[in-house]
């Protein structure tokens, strides 16, 4: 800065403030262009110097009780160098695709062997985590819209052996009337399936047993009726029956007195087949 000794303090103050404003406009334009960190650093130093001179002028014009001491002026931080600006800017930039959740005091974590915590949740998304085998799942309270409950949680598997362990991070407390979930919902569902299959198996066994019983009854009935039903006569049976009938009638006729037959006329011959 030029030495303004002998210059009107009022004009000097105005000039310093105008220069500071001009440097600020230049810096704003420069920040929109890439790879101009050296010029930006120089402008920052000029702006800082202008305001320092303006404060010095005010101290010389004002009452000594209200003026700023030199120590108070030096408390104002020196402008950072270009390398420091780059470093801070780089620290603020997150990796692509990564988002930092706003830090809140109402968050806590827990690790457990189950995801069930007794509250009603609805999953609204999941994301693959870098260097992690398992994705992170995002849940919100089921009553977010009907009761405006803002409670959320993030769940991620952290191990599988010897048992599955879940790492859960909660954000915010429930402000709704929580709907309790049965602790054994999935087990009961499995048990219902098992019961249904058991009943079905018992019914199949009963039908199979009934079918075997019906077959046995039909076999017994057919054997029983065969004793009462006449069977088709064989050739031998037909011959025996013919001989039996012939001898039977022959005995009947021979047992009568042939004289009794004479009154019906002369009988020349009787042949018995």
From Swiss-Prot:
GO terms for molecular function: DNA-binding transcription factor activity; sequence-specific DNA binding. Induction: Induced in response to potato aphid (e.g. M.euphorbiae) infestation and root-knot nematode (e.g. M.javanica) inoculation. Up-regulated by salicylic acid (SA) and suppressed by methyl jasmonate (MeJA). Its main location: nucleus. A motif (Nuclear localization signal) lies at residues 88-95. Pfam families: WRKY. It comes from the Eukaryota. Transmembrane segments: none annotated. It is found in: Nucleus. Keywords: DNA-binding, Nucleus, Plant defense, Transcription, Transcription regulation. Residues 110-179 bind DNA. Disruption phenotype: Attenuated Mi-1-mediated resistance against potato aphid (e.g. M.euphorbiae) and root-knot nematode (e.g. M.javanica). GO terms for biological process: defense response to nematode; regulation of defense response to insect; response to insect; response to jasmonic acid; response to nematode; response to salicylic acid. One of its GO terms (cellular component) is nucleus. Residues 76-103, 195-217 are annotated as: Disordered. Transcription factor involved in senescence, biotic and abiotic stress responses by modulating various phytohormones signaling pathways. Interacts specifically with the W box (5'-(T)TGAC[CT]-3'), a frequently occurring elicitor-responsive cis-acting element. Required for the resistance (R) gene Mi-1-mediated resistance to potato aphid (e.g. M.euphorbiae) and root-knot nematode (e.g. M.javanica). Belongs to the WRKY group III family. This is WRKY DNA-binding transcription factor 70. It comes from Solanum lycopersicum (Tomato).
